[in-house]
């Protein structure tokens, strides 16, 4: 993969578990299926994995996925953050975490205006992503945020908003920018 602001390629590793054994599995690269293989390496071609099931009507299969920019082993370790197979519990926890941020602002007005505001707040927090512990470029104990999209514009309103709503997150972003400067010179 590559990111929006850079042509530098990077690898995303993943580790997945299901609550139901697959009847068959494999990987694919380009147009070639590779049955019974459980890992694949980046070669610039489109690459993926598949699982096949025979399911009964309305049967649900739960999947947990961990990702990492470091290794498959780190992806497996990151998967441990999801402690349950209960989708509703995971969903409720995610909603609660978002509400901890979104509830910091109270809005008077009609529903349409509230939807616009809360959608914009949600979008503000989609990037940059906290990838602390996932820096493949250098070893650091500092926070790691490396996907500052259009920072030349977001410093005007988004980052002051972060300072008001989530000052510790904003502080970590600044520490990350300083760490990038120390290691890459910009």
Could you tell me what each predicted segment is?
Residues 86-143:
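Accessory "access/gating" subregions that flank catalytic or transport cores
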Residues 119-132, 147-171:
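Alpha-helical support elements that line or immediately flank enzyme active sites
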Residues 25-45, 92-99:
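Edge strands and adjacent loops of beta-rich recognition modules
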Residues 3-6:
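Short, small-residue-biased leader/transition segments that mark boundaries at the very start
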Residues 55-67:
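Short Pro-Gly-centered flexible turn/kink motifs
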Residues 47-51:
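Short strand-edge motifs at loop-to-beta-strand transitions and within beta-strands
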Residues 138, 169-186:
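Helix-terminus loop motifs that line ligand-binding clefts
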Residues 67-79:
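Terminal amphipathic helices with adjacent charged low-complexity linkers/tails
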């Amino acid at each position: 993969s590559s990111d929006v602001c850079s042509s530098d390629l990077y690898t995303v590793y993943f580790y997945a578990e299901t609550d139901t054994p697959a009847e068959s599995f494999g990987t694919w690269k380009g147009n070639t299926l590779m049955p019974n293989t459980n890992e694949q390496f980046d070669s610039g071609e489109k690459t993926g994995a598949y699982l096949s099931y025979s399911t009964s009507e309305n049967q649900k299969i739960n999947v947990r996925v961990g990702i990492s920019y470091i290794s498959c082993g780190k992806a497996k370790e990151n998967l441990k953050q999801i402690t349950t197979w209960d989708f509703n519990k995971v969903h409720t926890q995610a909603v609660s975490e978002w509400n901890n941020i979104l509830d910091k602002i109270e809005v008077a007005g009609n529903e349409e205006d509230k939807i616009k505001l809360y959608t914009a707040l949600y979008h503000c927090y989609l990037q940059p992503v906290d990838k602390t512990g996932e820096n493949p470029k250098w070893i650091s104990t500092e926070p790691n945020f490396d996907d500052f999209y259009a920072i030349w514009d977001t410093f005007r309103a988004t980052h002051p908003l972060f300072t008001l709503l989530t000052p510790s997150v904003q502080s970590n972003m600044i520490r990350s920018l300083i760490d990038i400067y120390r290691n890459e010179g910009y």
